[in-house]
Amino acid sequence: MEKSNGLRVILFPLPLQGCINPMIQLAKILHSRGFSITVIHTCFNAPKASSHPLFTFIQIQDGLSETETRTRDVKLLITLLNQNCESPVRECLRKLLQSAKEEKQRISCLINDSGWIFTQHLAKSLNLMRLAFNTYKISFFRSHFVLPQLRREMFLPLQDSEQDDPVEKFPPLRKKDLLRILEADSVQGDSYSDMILEKTKASSGLIFMSCEELDQDSLSQSREDFKVPIFAIGPSHSHFPASSSSLFTPDETCIPWLDRQEDKSVIYVSIGSLVTINETELMEIAWGLSNSDQPFLWVVRVGSVNGTEWIEAIPEYFIKRLNEKGKIVKWAPQQEVLKHRAIGGFLTHNGWNSTVESVCEGVPMICLPFRWDQLLNARFVSDVWMVGIHLEGRIERDEIERAIRRLLLETEGEAIRERIQLLKEKVGRSVKQNGSAYQSLQNLINYISSF
């Protein structure tokens, strides 16, 4: 770690697994460059402060009822948090600035998740520089602002012959992907996106956990669109080992189990921290894994199967059969798993964090996106980078079995592994000295040091 530079940065993540982890990783990066770190966080999904003793954590009241904390409607949750947290955050920032003034310390800036829409005017009123931190792929963040226009232009229902047509204003999405995004979102969601766009353009800068090698065209176009400095500092976890900021407790028995498997023989299955499925879909995945006759490590998150606690829908005799070839856990140390020599493929929902982690470890993917940016990420994996196989939304045992066999056993899988190895090397070079992400990070450090 570099010597303290006397500057403090305040970070404010959204309280979701896919937002907290990258923000804590950013905190580690900035701390290693000499910045003191304060993390403001909600009571809901509070990060584990004891895991990061070098940071200062300040908890604010979020006003969520017990019922609201259990909602699976992410957009509703974010709306409620934005309504409830403005006043507590204002008071928290006011106290931090007053304390810094008394102690003759400089607070450089506020870095908050772009999903917090009240922080721009708040920071401006306190004369505090604000940067927006984004956990999406750059191309999705840039293009998703055209969704209101596409909603007006889309002629429904789609004809069968149109399903695979490209969406020219949102490449490389297909029309069937766009339809799923629009069906899951609402006109109110369009309004929220408009506010994010407005606040982004008013910010002092935008930080992405991506790099030119993954987002080159969108990066240059975004600089023109937003007219603010943009820093693509690379995959967050490539700067430091896995963060211990998970909201779930990983099953550490995964690693010794993987140690007993052959190289590149195991299919790892996880649909992330938010996606839910029904009992029929759970059974189709189970049968697909069983029929593939390949070893598997399957994460079934508690509460991820609608109507049940965990895997109660799978008959006991079938669980015994599954356990002969694979291992089912409630959560896994994903970065550690993907690094393991035994992993041959990743059946994923294609959240951006999971997608980038898979690329960085050279693990080819089977794409099963469910919502929002996952649909775009999956198209990049299967259609642009060609480092994965797309299930095209079909959660069917035969499709899953076939995809696993194609990836692990057939020559198609060998070609995919070669391509993802090349992509891994390109992204890896970006975070090393003189790489694009390394230079962007250095530019960010210099920029926030100048405030």
From Swiss-Prot:
Enzyme class: transferase
Protein name: UDP-glycosyltransferase 76C4
Molecular-function GO term, any one: nicotinate-N-glucosyltransferase activity
GO CC entries: cytosol
Chain positions recorded as UDP-alpha-D-glucose binding sites: 273, 332-334, 349-357, 371-374
Annotated signal sequence range: none
Disulfide bond residue pairs: none
Entry superkingdom: Eukaryota
Keyword Transferase among UniProt keywords: yes
Gene3D superfamilies per record: Glycogen Phosphorylase B
